[in-house]
């Protein structure tokens, strides 16, 4: 056999069978010895690797065995506790029943002992009376005999023997305290280990997303009366479909749910979707999770754009407050630059106050003059949307509405044909009005604590509601030709904003019935211009 045919290449994967074949079939010689040594070395290396693999597997088995022993010990301890609890209950019941029997025995014994004592006394008195009467028969003196006879008559009349009941007050029957635990023994014989609950099944058809609430409904694949409660877990996500393992949000847990339905209310929908999963629990253990379900939670989310807001407004993401000192330092800097012949028009970067973050969204000029305005940072280009605004109690003047992006930096909401709003004025005289294109319509309704804004971009409708009662305050009917931004004006006070809200069901219902009302933007054409 040609030994050159069996030269091993470096890193060649040589099986044990091939190496053994080479050792067995190579002709003895100087070169063949080297090949046999190399083949044997391959066998040794393969055996060593296999030994390591087997040893690792043995270690795994030992670890598993240790886990079985530890878990079995824990389960046995729990089993002992459960049976000790049963024994304790049985001992308590036994002790209680023994006490009942002993009490009944003592009661009857006392009654019978009392009767025996009474009878003994009556018998003793009767025997004395009998002996006295017998002796009286031997009295010869008539007067003495007559006296004794009267005494005997009186004593007989008063004798307890004639008033004594000769019927036992109690019987010796104790059968009312007998027991028969055959049924309980049968129940005890049916004791067995609790099964692990099966995974519930969430029914997407029965789940409901409405009014910033989510109702999740599920069912068990088969009836299981051992289930004690359910655990519902949910998390927000921006990904459709199955939950991602590396999703950045953690599961939130709702425990101890007794039914097969649960409603989460008062949610802020600041993500596109929510994942849900549920598991059933019996007294011992929780079962597997259900297949996760992803529900859409679509809503308009936006913050206030502090990069273009008026310098006299202190703006945070969801609140704005009048700040009369805002921008004064910037104004003095601007005036100084004007004296040097430089332009006095402030850029967003130049006008950002010290406490205000840099103008990262600044795609437009900052509002100035008497336009104490701040816009939302998200444009509405289609669909129906809803948000709510609440004013501080001491707020002197504010406006709530929408505007095109082209709203000028000196323009006030409602005074141009590119903005629509309702305006509240509590300064000097109280007014509540709808404004558009510099025209005003007074509203004969009470200013609500919180205002709900409904914008139907495609339908060309902007409506304002009492956010609490859902009473319609006013509705503009128009045709939006550009994307609109939520707009807010405030003077001497502040506003807080609620976003991530679905269009309330009550508003949707009212929209269907109010689409024909006359309170529209066209009705402002005949109103006196301010």
From Swiss-Prot:
InterPro entries per UniProt: B30.2/SPRY, B30.2/SPRY_sf, Bbox_C, Butyrophylin_SPRY, ConA-like_dom_sf, COS_domain, E3_ligase_FN3/SPRY, FN3_dom
Record field: compositional bias (Basic and acidic residues): 330-341
Comp. bias (Polar residues): 342-354
UniProt-listed CDD domains: FN3, SPRY_PRY_FSD1
Residue positions where Phosphoserine is found in the record: 520, 523
Residue span of region Disordered: 322-366
Domain COS: 137-194
UniProt KW keywords: Acetylation, Coiled coil, Phosphoprotein
Domain B30.2/SPRY: 300-506
Entry protein name: FSD1-like protein
Lineage, top ranks: Eukaryota, Metazoa, Chordata, Craniata, Vertebrata
